[in-house]
Amino acid sequence: MTGDDQDSGQVSGLGRIELSLLDPQPSTEQIVAVIERARQEGIGAVWLPPTSFPVRGIGGEGDAQGSVRLCSVAGYPTGQHHVLVTASEAHMAVANGADEVTVVLDPAHVYGGPDATGDLNALIGEIVTLREAVPYPAVLRVALGTVRGAGQVTGSVPAAVLQTVARAAVAAGADVVVGPSDDAPGEGSAEETIRILAEAVAGSSVTVMSGRVLSFDDPGAFDVVERLSAAGAHRVVLDAASLSTGSTA
């Protein structure tokens, strides 16, 4: 999708999106190109792999990326890591310049508990550990990963599980709850996930965002952004791979 193709609705949607460049080994040139594009378009954040920090080649100290916030990930994409390993990964990202970290929660906790709707105490304990590793003012996002509970290979996450994760995030001091990255857009899936999470965190300072990574080149991407935003998503993620190669420039 080129700048010439963006109508007013698409341009307004740019303020609600973030760009993801989670290629295992993005080059410095790719990273710089995506951050610069985000800055030009008024996009608020760019996701980068933990190994990309500290980010180099984007300006002087204190004003490296302008208003663009740099986000990293930890425990990505499954969450099947010891919490201390995940916390260490998150802490290193912040120590090396990440403004925000999205941490994938342990699926054993997400789908734990006697009724498999989430082990609230275990989730709170996990998020408290992560919060200590990602101290304020850094932003801690907690996400559901791609691994489902027993008997759930794919498909939407049960509402009760989403509600438990949201409750834990509020109780343990997370800033954002992120839906699963493999939750497909469409009625009864990604939008419904966002609605459930938004209702569960209502009245708190915790916000909700979609974990589904949409294609920046998809003509319908901004329609999906609008639907997810209407459902309660504070931000939506678009894949920045094509931008880093200059195909949309």
Task: Indicate residue ranges for each PLM-predicted region.
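Intrinsically disordered, low-complexity repeat/linker tracts enriched for polar/charged residues
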Residues: M1-T2, Q6, Q10
